[in-house]
C-alpha cells in the first residue's frame, strides 16, 4: 500500500488516537500527545461525516475533560488546529482551550 506523506500523517493520528482511547478505557489519564491525537481524530472524522466547521469547533471542547488527562495538560493544550477535508473542500479547524 502506497500512502502519500499526508495520508501517512492522518493514519498516524488515528492510530495514536486509538491507542489513547484504549488507555483511557483502562482508566489511565492521558498525556499531551494522547489528548491531542484524540481531539484531532475527532475533528477529522467529524469533517468526514459532513459536520460544519463551527459545529466541530464547539464540539471539540467536549471530547475530553480535566479528569481524562494528566495534571497540567489542559494548560499546555491551548489550541488544536487541523486541516480537515470536508465535502466542499479542505478547511482549517481550530479549537481554542479544547479541555476546559
Curated annotation (Swiss-Prot):
This is Urease subunit gamma. Its main location: cytoplasm. Its EC number is 3.5.1.5. Pathway: Nitrogen metabolism; urea degradation; CO(2) and NH(3) from urea (urease route): step 1/1. Belongs to the urease gamma subunit family. It is found in: Cytoplasm. The lineage of its organism: Bacteria, Bacillati, Actinomycetota, Actinomycetes, Frankiales. Keywords: Cytoplasm, Hydrolase. One of its GO terms (molecular function) is urease activity. Disulfide bonds: none annotated. InterPro entries: Urease_gamma (IPR012010), Urease_gamma/gamma-beta_su (IPR002026), Urease_gamma_sf (IPR036463), Urease_subunit (IPR050069). It comes from Frankia casuarinae (strain DSM 45818 / CECT 9043 / HFP020203 / CcI3). Signal peptide: none annotated. Heterotrimer of UreA (gamma), UreB (beta) and UreC (alpha) subunits. Three heterotrimers associate to form the active enzyme. It catalyses: urea + 2 H2O + H(+) = hydrogencarbonate + 2 NH4(+). One of its GO terms (biological process) is urea catabolic process.
Amino acid at each position: 500500500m502506497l500512502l502519500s506523506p499526508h495520508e501517512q500523517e492522518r493514519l498516524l493520528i488515528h492510530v495514536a488516537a486509538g491507542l489513547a482511547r484504549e488507555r483511557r478505557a483502562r482508566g489511565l489519564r492521558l498525556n499531551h500527545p494522547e489528548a491531542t491525537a484524540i481531539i484531532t481524530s475527532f475533528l477529522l472524522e467529524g469533517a468526514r461525516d459532513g459536520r460544519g466547521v463551527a459545529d466541530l469547533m464547539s464540539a471539540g471542547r467536549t471530547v475530553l475533560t480535566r479528569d481524562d488527562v494528566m495534571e497540567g495538560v489542559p494548560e499546555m493544550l491551548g489550541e488544536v488546529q487541523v486541516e480537515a477535508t470536508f465535502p466542499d473542500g479542505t478547511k482549517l479547524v481550530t479549537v481554542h482551550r479544547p479541555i476546559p
